[in-house]
Amino acid sequence: MRRRKAPVRPVLPDPVYGSKVLTKFINAVMLDGKKSTAQKVMYSALERIESKTGEKGIEVFNKAMDNIKPVMEVKSRRVGGATYQVPIEVRPARQQSLGIRWIVEAARKRNERTMMERLSNELMDAATEKGSAFKKKEDTYKMAEANKAFAHYRW
């Protein structure tokens, strides 16, 4: 284990919308350090959302993020030879990073032609509480509910 807690590095807000969450999302979409490509994909996905829904792209994005953030998750805990799935609350920073990760993973697995289309469709689905990223959140919550009996093993 590390001696000290790692300092949280500051994140600059993105140049178009001024959102720090969007910057983190762009960084998650980025492959091989190609940030400008990731920005193009993300901004064109948000524009596509605007043309499809008529709402502002950033508002749909924020709504999707709020819908995907998990409140509870399970952690494995070994107690005398048995491994229990112990439900725990998720810290806000982890909620955000899990939400981002789940949306990007779900978008990459979709069958649309371009990443921009996949991402915009996944964000629209997440905003309306559909899609595989939302399903992942629901499954995580169900696991936590099912293992509520082991909540006293929390540490």
From Swiss-Prot:
Superkingdom field: Bacteria
GO terms, molecular function: rRNA binding; structural constituent of ribosome; tRNA binding
Keyword RNA-binding: yes
Keywords for this protein: Ribonucleoprotein, Ribosomal protein, RNA-binding, rRNA-binding, tRNA-binding
SUPFAM superfamilies in alphabetical order: Ribosomal protein S7
Example of a GO cellular component annotation carried by this entry: small ribosomal subunit
Pfam families in the record: Ribosomal_S7
GO annotation terms (biological process): translation
Protein purpose: One of the primary rRNA binding proteins, it binds directly to 16S rRNA where it nucleates assembly of the head domain of the 30S subunit. Is located at the subunit interface close to the decoding center, probably blocks exit of the E-site tRNA.
The family this protein is said to belong to: Belongs to the universal ribosomal protein uS7 family.
Subunit composition and interactions: Part of the 30S ribosomal subunit. Contacts proteins S9 and S11.
HAMAP family: Ribosomal_uS7_B
Alphabetical list of NCBIfam families matching this protein: rpsG_bact
Protein name as annotated: Small ribosomal subunit protein uS7
Species of the source: Sulfurovum sp. (strain NBC37-1)
